[in-house]
């Protein structure tokens, strides 16, 4: 149920989809491949450094990378890009849809949780096209996925609370791993 000041709009109007990021062809940038995205982790760092050849996805620190291919999307491969050097740009697999908060509409942290929300993910999965085993979500499908978003201050509060919970989950995961290694 939407509260006061909540707005319903198509996902591609609530967030920026595949926003423009300038990279110089031939220059070396951080690269993220699909294998690096862990469905259990909120963020993903670069897999390696690679020269930019002109194709694939492009993103900056804090952007959300959502798998667009089967079975990766069904497995929950959605994460925020964590640049190792500040706001540095990176590039990655052609099988990512890049999501960023839209200025004055959505907070970037909230955009991640909105993308990760099961309602959006299930909708995207239902819109996959292509041959069996190689199905993809067309970017155009995001214009038909309606989402309800709160005001920016509420978005920031929601993203902060969920981020704090994710931090605690990650800390518990690391503690469990340490205990298992002992």
Regions found by a protein language model. Give the residues of each.
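Residues that recognize and position ribonucleotide moieties
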Residues: 4, 30, 89-90, 113, ...
């Amino acid at each position: 149920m939407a509260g006061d000041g909540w707005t319903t709009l198509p996902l591609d109007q609530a967030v920026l989809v595949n926003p423009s990021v300038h990279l110089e062809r031939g220059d070396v940038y951080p690269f993220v491949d699909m294998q690096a995205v862990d469905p259990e982790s909120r963020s993903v760092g670069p897999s390696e450094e690679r020269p930019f050849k002109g194709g694939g996805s492009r993103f900056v620190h804090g952007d959300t990378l959502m798998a667009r291919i089967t079975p990766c999307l069904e497995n929950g491969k959605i994460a925020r890009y964590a640049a190792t050097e500040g706001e540095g740009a990176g590039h990655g697999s052609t099988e990512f849809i890049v999501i960023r908060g839209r200025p004055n509409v959505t907070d970037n942290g909230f955009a991640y949780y909105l993308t990760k929300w099961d309602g959006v993910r299930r909708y995207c999965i239902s819109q996959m096209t292509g041959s069996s085993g190689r199905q993809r979500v067309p970017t155009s499908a995001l214009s038909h996925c309606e989402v309800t978003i709160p005001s920016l201050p509420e978005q920031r509060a929601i993203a902060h609370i969920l981020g704090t919970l994710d931090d605690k989950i990650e800390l518990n995961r690391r503690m469990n791993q340490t205990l298992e290694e002992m």
